[in-house]
Amino acid sequence: MISGATNIFKIPELKRRILITFLFLAIYRVGVHIPTPGINGDALASFFKQMSGTLFGLIDMFSGGAFERLSVFALGIMPYISASIILQLLTVVIPYLERLQKEGEMGRKKIVQYTRYGTVVLSMIQGFGIAIGLENMRGTAGEMIVLVPGWSFRIMTVITLTAGTAFIMWLGEQITERGIGNGISLIIFAGIVARMPNAIAQSYELFTVGQMSIITVLVLILIMVFVVAVIIFVETGQRRLPVQYAKRIVGRRVYGGQSTHLPLKLNTSGVIPPIFASSILMFPLTIANFMPKPWLEEHPWVQSILNSLGPGALLYNLLYVGFIIFFCYFYTAVTFNPNDVAENMKKFGGYIPGLRPGQKTAEYIDKVLTRITLGGALYVSAVCVLPTILYARFNVPFYFGGTSLLIVVGVALDTVQQIEAHMLTRHYEGLMKKGRLKGRRG
């Protein structure tokens, strides 16, 4: 692996792409620390301390800490992700978008353009909502977060946050085009990884004051390593369906006749299900934080429901697993259509041995996909619920939740695979000598 890594610097284009990627990520991290005008930073920091474990924490994770500081990049890349998901869902119900999706490169460019428009619209709506919300928020000492409330602040905030999101979106596209890896994913990756030094420092502080024993630290490290190993194993795992292409004679040339496979990932839906599940479960707790405390004291049943929906509670974990499994199936059904796959195979003379091309093939693919999606959903549930159980068991902060680990490991694997592909096409030794994990055939 070391010799493979040294080969990176022997390929000028690959070296240039990696340097460009680091440059754009550095620009992004600088922007995270540029504050939005008109904000009382101390009051905002004290407000966010009491909002831990709510939807704000999830948004802050995807913004790389920018939301907590309310910097110009406070919205992060979430509006772009939301717009992409909405477009994917709309392709199922709107025939025009479905046709665009099947038109190849031109259709894809059109959908990307619509996604950009959607990102700007969502950023403006969210920016206005944040501006209104900030005007009504107070710090722990009762101080105002917004220095001068009014329409001038609202308009300035909308323009600033929308421009920030548009710039992040542009950075992501530039990384994808000129750098290495998926730009949007790498921006989220950089935001999560940037918190590591602070998390390690806080853990060390807990250890030095005696709140964490050496055994607890070792157990947490071992569990982290184990979870990362499981994520790597599952994310690289595939179920490979054998595909045979019939021979075709065109003039004097013979086409087809080769054997290949259709790879089905165990976790087709990625990190979208836990994100959706977390958003739904954190919403009631987020709303409750804006409720007057006297009103909550007058209605103890509301407080008991909120306590049972808090991270780490049994009901929370059960609902979390249920929502993850549901969204795994739902998102897989939206993004992977067995009928389209079977139709494309039939069009190019491909078939799965023992099955008739067309409907029978589609039914078989759907059956296999349904089976492996259950395994993938249970795996995602275990990875995401484990941190909350650890928090309750050891009573220590678990700074990197399951969603964060899934994103970090998944993006790292994807980037390494792209670097390896660049090296292998130029006949250099890759980062990994042996082939990747092979899926079970048939």
Spans of model-derived segments:
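N-terminal cationic and glycine-rich segments that engage phosphates or anionic surfaces
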Residues: 1-101, 106-442
